[in-house]
């Protein structure tokens, strides 16, 4: 058997019907579309049009708003930071900043910086320079003799 010997099973596929090639073909003149009207024309559907009925996107109410003063922190747990230290991606001698965390692949850059959360176990004494931290994270860091400096988050408009 060769590649050029392979073919579909007989009767498994049907060749497409060429329409509009004379009335003798059976699909001439109106090409199987019936007679006049919107459905006989090309480009039948008007997106979102429901025949004059109020469309669903106008029937449903608008909801919520985007708060320009909200803070969007990238949350990182202490256990995740310890994993990066164990893998040799974070240097314990240098302060842990958002740039260091992004470079280590611990998190992506967030609009308002990083928030450290206390889930997991931290074994190394570290100095943190981050936008925010939970009470449990601060307690765990200070218990090991480390320190944490909370930076004031820069507004997104100031970066542009």
Swiss-Prot record:
Q: Which GO terms describe its molecular function?
A: rRNA binding; structural constituent of ribosome
Q: Extract one GO cellular component term from the record.
A: cytosolic large ribosomal subunit
- SUPFAM superfamilies per the UniProt record, alphabetical: Ribosomal proteins L15p and L18e (SSF52080)
Whether RNA-binding counts among this entry's keywords is yes
Feature: compositional bias, Gly residues: 21-35
Per the record, where are the segments of Polar residues compositional bias?
1-14
| Family annotation (PROSITE patterns) | RIBOSOMAL_L15
Pfam families associated with the record: Ribosomal_L27A
Annotated region (Disordered) at 1-35
Keywords attached to this Swiss-Prot or TrEMBL record, sorted alphabetically, are: Ribonucleoprotein, Ribosomal protein, RNA-binding, rRNA-binding
InterPro entries from the entry?
Answer: Ribosomal_uL15 (IPR030878), Ribosomal_uL15/eL18 (IPR021131), Ribosomal_uL15/eL18_sf (IPR036227), Ribosomal_uL15_bac-type (IPR005749), Ribosomal_uL15_CS (IPR001196)
Transmembrane residues, as ranges?
Answer: none
GO biological process terms on file: translation
* Classification via NCBIfam families: rplO_bact
Instruction: Describe the protein's quaternary organization and the partners it interacts with.
Output: Part of the 50S ribosomal subunit.
Q: What does this protein do?
A: Binds to the 23S rRNA.
Instruction: State the family named in the UniProt similarity comment for this chain.
Output: Belongs to the universal ribosomal protein uL15 family.
Q: Mind telling me what this protein is named?
A: Large ribosomal subunit protein uL15
């Amino acid at each position: 058997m060769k590649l050029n010997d392979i073919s579909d099973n007989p009767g498994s596929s049907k060749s497409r019907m060429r329409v509009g090639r004379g009335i003798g073909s059976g699909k001439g003149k109106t090409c199987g579309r019936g007679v006049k009207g919107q459905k006989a024309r090309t480009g039948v559907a008007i997106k979102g049009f429901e025949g004059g009925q109020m469309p669903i996107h106008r029937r449903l109410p608008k909801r919520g708003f985007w708060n320009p003063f909200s803070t969007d922190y990238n949350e990182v747990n202490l256990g995740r930071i310890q994993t990066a230290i164990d893998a040799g991606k974070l240097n314990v001698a240098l302060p842990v900043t958002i740039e260091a965390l992004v470079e280590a692949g611990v998190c992506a850059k967030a609009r308002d910086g990083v928030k450290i959360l206390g889930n997991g176990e931290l074994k190394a004494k570290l100095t943190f320079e981050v936008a925010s931290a939970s009470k449990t994270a601060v307690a765990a860091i200070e218990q090991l003799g480390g320190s944490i400096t909370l930076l004031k988050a820069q507004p997104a408009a100031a970066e542009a």
